[in-house]
UniProtKB/Swiss-Prot annotation:
GO terms for molecular function: GTP binding; GTPase activity. The gene is RAB1BV. Residues 183-215 are annotated as: Disordered. This is Ras-related protein RAB1BV. GTP binds at residues 22-29, 70-74, 128-131. Coiled coil: none annotated. Belongs to the small GTPase superfamily. Rab family. It is found in: Cell membrane.
């Protein structure tokens, strides 16, 4: 039987595709660069369409290869972004804690997920730029948590600049996806096998003869 598409070859146990979505300028590319390369820059060029990075991590003794796609937040690239939803196993919804409109638009991004992504896709809410001075904060932590609770998803505040919770957010969603895949494997293995026995030809012939005689 063919292996499920998320499974690995020799160098990893699981291949997990993640998608970063959210408005332009919320720091998706910075989060990706911090997690994949351990670096931060303020001179990012706005993502045009789609970009991705790969990082392999270890969880519970398993090697997890993360393929992380960074999407453009601009409206004109929305159709490109939605084309990548279907294959995503986990989606990080990112907003800027200093930009209330980016937070309010999270509901629109969730509607896009509901329209285009798989039903069982894992989601996580990320409030980025948490290192900014409190006087610049437009979205209180409690408000972000309340939205996450409303949708039944996890919530983290992060800073790509200071590396606050960046590892934690990616490891958290990867762990949840790995568990979902493992549970799916367990259910498949637990399904009883069905054996089809060959028909008793003599019995069938007798039945056919009896039916003939009775007609």
């Amino acid at each position: 039987m063919a292996a499920p598409p998320a499974r690995a070859r020799a160098d990893y146990d699981y291949l997990i595709k993640l998608l970063l979505i959210g408005d332009s300028g919320v720091g998706k590319s910075c989060l990706l660069l911090r997690f994949s390369d351990g670096s931060f820059t303020t001179s990012f060029i706005t993502t045009i369409g789609i970009d991705f990075k790969i990082r392999t991590i270890e969880l519970d003794g398993k090697r997890i290869k993360l393929q992380i796609w960074d999407t453009a937040g601009q409206e004109r690239f929305r159709t490109i972004t939605t084309a990548y939803y279907r294959g995503a196993m986990g989606i990080l919804l990112v907003y800027d804690v200093t930009d209330e409109s980016s937070f309010n638009n999270i509901r629109n991004w969730i509607r896009n997920i509901e329209q285009h992504a798989s039903d069982n896709v894992n989601k996580i809410l990320v409030g980025n730029k948490a290192d900014m001075d409190e006087s610049k904060r437009a979205v209180p932590t409690a408000k972000g948590q309340a939205l996450a609770d409303e949708y039944g998803i996890k919530f983290f505040e992060t800073s790509a600049k200071t590396n606050l919770n960046v590892e934690e957010v990616f490891f958290s969603i990867a762990r949840d996806i790995k568990q979902r895949l493992a549970d799916s494997d367990t259910r498949q293995e637990a399904q009883p096998s069905i054996t089809i026995k060959p028909a008793d030809q003599s019995g069938n012939q007798a039945a056919a003869k009896s039916a003939c005689c009775g007609s």
